[in-house]
Regions:
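Short loop/turn motifs at secondary-structure junctions and domain boundaries
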Residues: 1-4, 52, 117-119
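Histidine-rich, glycine-flanked metal-binding segment
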Residues: 1-41
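Divalent metal-coordination and catalytic microenvironments
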Residues: 11, 16, 35, 46, ...
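Short beta->alpha connector loops
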Residues: 54-55, 143-144, 171-174
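Divalent-metal coordination cores built from histidine and acidic residues
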Residues: 57-165
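Functional cores that coordinate and move charged inorganic groups
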Residues: 152-185
Length: 185
């Protein structure tokens, strides 16, 4: 993918997973793809599906044919309007579709303490969302000043996802002396 090289090889698949690339495999079934190119699917590591103004099922129709197989989605926009019901809608609409949608819990609802929104998700709400199995981690913690200051609510949200991925968001942090501490260094 990165070098632009094309390798002529066989691909061994077992239980729906690629288990080998090369030659000399013994197969119970073969598919001739001579002249075809097989490439990995694209994983979009950060997307807000709602920004496309369509639900996940419609979003999938646009991105899957173009090679995207998986998205890591932070549904904080719909959560700011509809709260936990919005997140549950996103999960239901994405289920069983052709696109793997990995939802993260929206950490910033409302988006900042300076704005209002249709919902508020506190640490308890996010802990319940984690327990529901609908999310795989904590999405985009945008309140990096709160992280650096050890704000109790922000830290409780992060703590609710101990052992899972917690996404950060720190524009302009750069060489800030606390930068290493923000990532646990």
């Amino acid at each position: 993918v990165f070098s632009g090289e094309v390798h002529d090889a066989d691909i061994a698949i077992a239980d729906g997973k690629i288990v080998g690339v090369g030659t000399g495999f013994t197969a119970t079934e073969t598919i001739d793809v001579t002249g075809k190119v097989i490439a990995p699917g694209f994983i979009d590591a950060h997307v807000h599906i709602e920004s496309s103004m369509v639900p996940p099922s419609r979003f999938a129709r646009a991105v899957v044919p173009r090679g995207t197989t998986t998205v890591i989605a932070d549904p904080h926009e719909i959560a700011n309007v509809a709260g936990l019901d919005g997140v549950a809608f996103m999960a239901r609409d994405a289920r069983d579709g052709p696109l793997s949608v990995v939802l993260m819990a929206p950490s910033c609802v409302p988006a900042s303490h300076l704005t209002g929104s249709g919902a508020r998700l506190g640490a308890e709400d996010l802990a319940a969302l984690r327990s529901s199995g609908l999310v795989h981690g904590l999405g985009e913690v945008m309140n990096f000043p709160g992280v650096l200051a050890g704000d109790p609510e922000v830290m409780a949200k992060i703590g609710a996802f101990e052992g899972l991925v917690v996404d950060g968001h720190a524009p302009g942090l750069g060489a800030h002396p606390a930068g290493g501490g923000a990532v646990g260094a």
